[in-house]
Each structure stands twice: as C-alpha cells, then as structure tokens.
A protein has these predicted regions:
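Short, surface-exposed acidic
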Residues: 162-166, 266-279, 314-321
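Short, solvent-exposed loop/beta-turn-alpha elements that line the ligand-binding surface or hinge
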Residues: 59-62, 132, 209-216, 283-297
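Short, glycine-/small- and polar/acidic-enriched structural segments
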Residues: 25-171, 176, 180, 184-188
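Short, low-complexity disordered leader/linker segments with a strong preference
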Residues: 1-35, 62, 328-330
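Secondary-structure end/capping motifs
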Residues: 231-310
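Short polybasic/polar patches that bind polyanions
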Residues: 13, 55-56, 61, 100, ...
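Conserved C-terminal helix/tail region of periplasmic/extracytoplasmic solute-binding proteins
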Residues: 300-330
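Pocket-lining segment of extracytoplasmic ligand-binding domains
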Residues: 94-95, 174-177, 181-266
C-alpha cells in the first residue's frame, strides 16, 4: 500500500492544483460537449469494449460528453482519478479497497464484469487440476502480496502446503513463453489469455478462484471516479454511466459488431482474439445481475473480510462509500 501512496504523491506533484484548461473551457457553453477522460487499466482489450462502442456509436455525444480514452502510463488510473487528472478510470475492487484504507476517496461506479473470471492456468501436460497439485510446482507472478495470500487460501482448502510451492516473479514475460520455459502455471483472465490459448490450440487446465471461495468472487474490473467528482458534478457522472451502460448492453447483445468496433479503434489487436473473446465475455458482463454494472454490498464485504483475514488490509472500510449503483440507468 506504500507503493499506492507514493504513486499518488507523484501524480499530485505533477498535477499541481485546479482543473485542466480543457475542462474549464468545456464548461463554458451549454451547447458544447463537456470534455472528460477515462483512463484504462491496461492495453485495450474486451474488458473495455463498452467504452469504445459508446464512443463510436455516439452515445457519449448524446449525453453531452466528449470522452477521451487514455492509456495507462507510469501513474495508473487510480492515481490519476484520485489526483483529479482524469474524471474516470478502470480499476479493480482490491485497489479501491486499499486506496480507501489510505484515505484516498475513489469510488466504484459500475462492475464491468459481474463475476471474477480469473484463475490459475497451466498447460494440461502439467497435470495441475486442483490447488493440491500446486505442490512441487513453480508459480509465475508479478510480486504482489495478494498472490501468495490467494494461493495459500486455495491450497488450504485441500490441505496443501504453500511452502512446497516455488513462487517466482515472471515480470512482463508472455504467459505462453513462460509456461514452456520457466514456470508451471500463472494467474490469468480467461476472457483474454484463456481464449488466446483456445485459438493457439494449447489446452489449459483452469483452477478458478470462485470454485474455492465465494469471498474471492470480487469485482474485476470496475469503473471508478472520485468522491469529489460525485459531489461537484453528479450530472456528468450520470451522463457518463448512461452512455457506458448503453455501450456494454450493445456488446452483450451484438458481440460480433462490438468486436468490429474495438478492432477499428485499436487495429493492432488480433482480430480473431478480439472476436472470440467478445463472444466469450458477452454473456458474462451482466450474467445474473438485474442490470449491467450493478454491484452488491455483500461482495464488497466478503472480499474486505478476506483481505483483513489475510493481513492485506490495516483496517476495515465503509463499503457503502466504496461503491455506488446510484449512477446506473434506472
């Protein structure tokens, strides 16, 4: 969590004070589109499709907004949103929880995917079918404390010993390269890396987090903003979410067309991967929720309790301040 605070301090130092000149100008005339920005959490992928659909199909303009989609840089979306350098961002429940413990008031305003689709993936020849099979293997991660906590939690359900698992940092190494060379398994999001494996004809075994603990069925990713933005300009937040909701509803109902929109916006993406990933995600964006983006208090409480139990949080947060469904279309 110290890293989170350091990142925010750097952004604040760079940012200075006050609104950007663009936003000052954008608020000048009623008939002008209001300029706002949304920062991605990663390079563009199908988690982000609803944003690109809303942009391409004019949903943002219909709501009076001129939205710039920004790639994440050295400072991530959370830090930029917290510092007021971006109005919106893409985050995850874990990061927002950690930020609020540090007194940084960012808020989740919509769940992009209703359930956690991540898990531990391995080539079938590694014969890793359950957490018990992690013993004697090598896990490749990125060095975050949450990784060992999740691995331990899953292994405990089957009486396995975390000390018999070798955990290494694989950095930016590609999953498919790493599992052939350095590691036995890694933590992936099936909608992208899992679907890519299908296209490559490389069969995987998946150990999904949600198969072993309902407390690990947290929201990832989510759309975020700041408490300050909600307080000073709730109408813009409402307009943004109205357009984004239409974008994701379109992606749910028309995955092939939504994939074309993402490919047009980001031509460097693999068209086959985008198309198949979009098909896989379409029914999972909303899943069993009453509407896209909806969040539940118990999901926030469950994951906070799990993080506290594993020593990943210093104190509880008020989960009802960490998320809101207020800005979703009625």
């Amino acid at each position: 969590m110290k890293k989170w605070v350091v990142g925010l301090v750097l952004v604040l130092l760079l940012a200075g004070c006050g609104a950007t000149e663009e936003n000052k100008q954008g608020a000048g005339k009623k008939d002008e589109l209001k300029k706002v920005s949304v920062v991605l959490d990663w390079t563009p992928n199908t988690n982000h499709t609803g944003l690109y659909v809303a942009q391409e199909k004019g949903y943002f303009k219909e709501e009076g907004l001129d939205v710039e989609i920004i790639m994440p840089g050295e400072a991530g979306a959370d830090q930029l949103v917290a510092a007021g350098k971006a109005e919106f961002g893409i985050s995850v429940q874990e990061s927002i929880t950690e930020a609020r413990v540090q007194g940084v008031p960012i808020v989740s305003i919509g769940a992009i995917i209703q359930h956690n689709t991540s898990g531990f993936a391995s080539p079938v020849e590694k014969n890793i079918k359950s957490p018990k099979d992690f013993e004697g293997k090598t896990y490749g991660g990125w060095g975050a404390p949450v990784e060992k906590a999740v691995l331990t939690s899953l292994m405990d359900t089957e009486g396995a010993d975390i000390e018999k698992l070798d955990i290494v940092n694989m950095g930016d190494t590609d999953f498919f390269t790493a599992v052939k060379r350095d590691i036995d398994f890694a933590w992936i999001y099936y909608a992208w890396t899992g679907v890519e494996a299908e296209i490559r004809g490389e069969e995987l075994n998946m150990v999904y987090l949600t198969d072993y603990s309902e407390k690990l069925d947290y929201y990832t990713p989510v759309l975020s903003t700041s408490e300050k933005m909600i307080e000073k300009d709730p109408e813009t937040v409402k307009a943004f979410m109205a357009a984004v909701s239409k974008g994701y509803e379109f992606a749910i109902g028309h995955p092939a067309d939504a994939a074309k929109i993402l490919i047009k916006a980001e031509p460097d993406l693999d068209p086959e991967l985008v198309k198949k990933s979009q098909e896989w995600l379409a029914p999972r964006y909303k899943d069993d929720a009453a509407k896209w983006g909806e969040q539940k208090k118990e999901v926030w409480e469950n994951y906070m309790d799990w993080m506290l139990d594993k020593g990943l949080l210093e104190e509880e947060i008020d989960v009802e301040k960490a998320f809101t469904n207020e800005f979703l279309p009625k």
